[in-house]
Amino acid sequence: MDITELLAFSAKQGASDLHLSAGLPPMIRVDGDVRRINLPPLEHKQVHALIYDIMNDKQRKDFEEFLETDFSFEVPGVARFRVNAFNQNRGAGAVFRTIPSKVLTMEELGMGEVFKRVSDVPRGLVLVTGPTGSGKSTTLAAMLDYLNNTKYHHILTIEDPIEFVHESKKCLVNQREVHRDTLGFSEALRSALREDPDIILVGEMRDLETIRLALTAAETGHLVFGTLHTTSAAKTIDRVVDVFPAEEKAMVRSMLSESLQSVISQTLIKKIGGGRVAAHEIMIGTPAIRNLIREDKVAQMYSAIQTGGSLGMQTLDMCLKGLVAKGLISRENAREKAKIPENF
């Protein structure tokens, strides 16, 4: 079985990931659970050959030098995949994350009107956060697609690697892949300010320099979308501020309070009857929220979100209650993800 057959099988099963690991049969993750494919275990040289076949020379060199590498790979007519190849105690390994070839719209994903309102802001910082595999890329792709269909703007994305490919519809879209089209996030962001973008997507705000440049871009009149691995709006503010040295924290709080438009923290939950659905905590940069950021009163944010329902804000628990009421998720699954489980 070659790699394209394995990937086609994986996509057909609706898997989010295909795992190849020397010494074990191939496995797929479906609806959050890792399951074995009914095939014999793969030897190290088989796994090594499967991943080497789809790498270019630079990726092979990286893999040999650093013992791991990231790249993207497309099976025409099936999907694109984000690949991480690595070594483990039994030999070679690789994980293929499925990137659906079709960008789903906000309507198809069941995203409310508030997401359109957040996308429509002319400038500022919009952060979509959550753990790995929580659907951040899918949410952001839908928001960019909405803008691509409704505005005459220049959208510039900086990703590692490029996940969803956006055609230029009403917007001009330029997508840059780290290590292929640019040396790094901070380098690409620095030159982005001279590339006349209206909207900038920063695939990952990993380090101080990238976060600083994203804040500067938002402050200078661009709409900047970024992602972090935080699990709530309050933790997101802390994470951004904590990256900076003590003497800069007050200045960063001030910058954030002026430029932050929204924080959307999401998680995926198993649906009744199969599949998964996203649950969101949504914080909007209202005057009250901006004040809390400026005065370092992050602990009071949760209650400000609770009382901001009329403005489109919601806590994760409010969202979970709505999903339970619609019959989409079970109380048990809601309880697992809830901030206050006894409410379920």
Swiss-Prot record:
One Gene Ontology term of the molecular function aspect: ATP hydrolysis activity
Result when mutating residue 135 to S: Complete loss of ATPase activity and twitching activity
Domain of life: Bacteria
Phenotypic effect of disruption: Mutants retain surface pili but have lost twitching motility. In a mouse model of acute pneumonia, a decreased colonization of the liver is observed but not of the lung relative to the parental strain.
Location within or outside the cell: Cytoplasm
InterPro entries: AAA+_ATPase, P-loop_NTPase, PilT/PilU, T2SS/T4SS_dom, T4SS_GSP_E_ATPase
Family the entry assigns: Belongs to the GSP E family.
Name the UniProt record assigns to this protein: Type IV pilus retractation ATPase PilT
Organism: Pseudomonas aeruginosa (strain ATCC 15692 / DSM 22644 / CIP 104116 / JCM 14847 / LMG 12228 / 1C / PRS 101 / PAO1)
Encoding gene (name): pilT
